[in-house]
Regions:
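Rossmann-like dinucleotide-binding cores of NAD(P)H-dependent redox enzymes
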Residues: 59, 152-153, 160-218, 298-304, ...
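Mid-to-C-terminal Rossmann-like scaffold of FAD/NAD(P)H-dependent oxidoreductases
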Residues: 1, 284-396, 428-432, 436-462, ...
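Rhodanese-like catalytic fold shared by cysteine-dependent sulfurtransferases
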Residues: 417-428, 432-469, 477-510, 514-563
Length: 563
């Protein structure tokens, strides 16, 4: 069997190695347009920033190591320009020599990935306007940074690569401005959760110009102007385009393969295309979203590697299935970690899923053990079935651990209530006896059993302030004096029982505290005394973060003043 693989990064390289493990006698040829294979896309910004010191550390394998260990024929700096499905051949052009030749195949695997989205704007070809997708892109940017010593940079786009580059450039002393049309960074997060990311970026000197549209670029001596549709141009020493990626599928289209959403390659669960003996994997293919069941584009290394393995199994006569992706991701931004899995509120609304949510502010580990850091968790679940839909976490330590637990729970099709039963490891340096994931389950259990009702930050301003409802802030007087919601009366939780006679049982009570715990306790107390009560999800901290983009402070025992 002769297998030709087009593309040698995540999906292609994984498939090549897997095929060899399954079939020692297969002839495997991997053709890669760039000069590198099996490189770490996700590590490229950290090489620019000097966190990864040596270029060699970016490549997990080389053409030589692929041959020595796997006897795989890797051809870099060569581009497949055409596919003949009937003749089962590909046309290849050697980029350095210009030589053109054909290669036959028994099985063909397409792993071309995606290319940076470059809008048709004036000035994008400037030598000071960069994209970042390949090792060559990385080397070009690093040479520029080391040689020109830029003091200012504009990043067009606020996705993963854009934010990682913003962090690395800022850590090098470059003044960074992020410009993008959407009004929030990191699309997988809801806008309220993205507020914490905005605050962290600003805290480290990164300027955000959100809701603004780039109209073009213009060279201005040793700088470049970023032209904005409704604002004055931005002057900078360099520009990075990071507005997203587009599936690289011109080969598939020209060969007559069926295409999916946004021009991606349509495949089945076996990673087979519409043409026999042609498979496709990675950022170029559409997938089924595990939560919604709808077609989606999810450009992440994890799914690409899994798809490569599955395609290899089936090429070698197996029967493996790719059951979909839920888009689990994690990102480091200065001292913050942002992670998500499944769908957010916008996606749930688009899919027509009736959902509810909880917001909590747990600590990374037991607060009495030194070094505990706060995190903000948001968990979505389907109202009727209670199945988990998605989760978002932003904070310090322990974010990755919790998002992976929740991602596993979603994959296992657990209900939100089953989170309460998870037996998770505990020791004071690592967690609490009630892990944050358990706590999310407890909160959902109380909501669904009717023990408590909640309202959300975007409902605060619409609460009645005409005396027809009681608005209570149950934090300490010290906390209340530092800032409070308009119209809320301060009655500390520990004093609430002494003030019950001052409340009218015929009027609803809305309760607020710092993070939602004490207001929950207050509602449980008030409910048992005959009051109709609801508490603010996420509390004053979440409201403030969303409304003013201020980060929550380090955790301390709820109800105690931090001296």
């Amino acid at each position: 069997m002769k297998v030709v693989i087009v593309g040698g990064v995540a999906g292609g390289a994984s498939a090549a190695a897997r095929i060899r493990r399954l079939d020692e006698h297969a002839q495997i040829i991997m053709i890669e347009r760039s000069g590198y294979v099996s490189y770490a896309n996700c590590g490229l910004p950290y090489y620019v920033g000097g966190v990864i010191k040596e270029q060699e550390e970016l490549t997990l394998q080389t053409p030589e190591s692929f041959w020595d260990r796997f006897r795989i024929d890797v051809r870099v700096r060569q581009e497949v320009t055409a596919i003949d499905p009937e003749g089962k051949t590909v046309t290849v052009r050697a980029l350095d020599s210009g030589k053109i030749y054909t290669e036959t195949y028994d099985k063909l695997l397409l792993a071309p990935g995606a290319k940076p989205t470059v809008p048709a704007l004036s000035g994008v070809s400037s030598e000071r306007v960069f994209t970042l997708r390949t090792v060559e892109d990385t080397l070009r940017i690093r040479r520029f940074v080391e040689g020109q010593k830029p003091k200012t940079a504009v990043l067009a786009g606020g996705g993963f690569i854009g934010l990682e580059m913003a962090e690395n450039l800022a850590e090098m002393g470059v003044s960074v401005t992020i410009v993008q049309r959407p009004k929030q960074l990191l699309a997988p997060l809801d806008a309220d959760m993205a507020s914490f990311v905005h605050a962290e970026m600003r805290r480290h000197g990164v300027a955000l110009r959100l809701g603004e549209t780039v109209a073009g670029f213009r060279q201005d001596g040793d700088s470049v102007l970023t032209l904005l549709e409704e604002s004055e141009p931005l002057h900078s020493d360099m520009v990075l385009l990071a507005i997203g990626v587009t599936p690289d599928t011109h080969l598939a289209k020209d060969a007559g393969l069926r295409l999916g959403i946004r021009g991606s390659i349509a495949v089945n669960e076996r990673m087979e295309t519409s043409v026999p003996d042609i498979y496709a994997v990675g950022d170029a293919v559409e997938v089924t979203h595990f939560v919604t069941g709808q077609k989606a584009l999810i450009s992440l290394a994890g799914p690409a590697n899994k798809q490569g393995r599955i395609a290899a199994d089936n090429i070698c006569g197996g029967s493996s299935r790719f059951t979909g992706s839920q888009g689990s991701s994690v990102l480091k931004l200065f001292g913050l970690t942002a992670a998500s899995t499944g769908i957010n509120e916008k996606a749930a609304q688009t899919a027509g899923i009736a959902y509810d949510k909880v917001v909590l502010f747990p600590a990374s580990h037991a607060t009495y053990y030194p070094g505990a850091r706060s995190m903000t968790m948001k968990v979505l679940y389907e109202k009727e079935s209670l199945r988990l839909l998605g989760a978002q976490i932003v904070g310090g330590d322990g974010v990755d651990k919790r998002i992976d637990v929740l991602a596993t729970a979603i994959r296992a099709k657990m209900t939100a209530l089953e989170l309460t039963e998870l037996d998770l490891s505990y020791a004071p340096p690592y967690s609490s006896a009630k892990d944050p994931v358990n706590m999310a389950g407890f909160m959902i259990e109380d909501l669904e059993s009717g023990k408590v009702r909640q309202f959300h930050w975007d409902e605060v301003d619409d609460l009645p302030r005409d005396g027809s409802a009681a608005l209570l802030d149950v934090r300490t007087e010290w906390e209340y004096q530092r800032g409070h919601l308009d119209g809320f009366r301060n009655v500390p939780l520990d004093d609430l029982r002494e003030h019950l006679d001052e409340l009218d049982r015929s009027k609803p009570v809305y309760v607020n505290c710092q993070t939602g715990l004490r207001s929950y306790l207050a509602c449980r107390l008030l409910t048992q005394y005959g009051f109709a009560c609801a508490h603010l999800a996420g509390g004053y901290s979440f409201y403030q973060a969303v409304m003013k983009e201020r980060l929550a402070q380090s955790p301390y025992p709820c109800g105690m003043e931090k001296l």
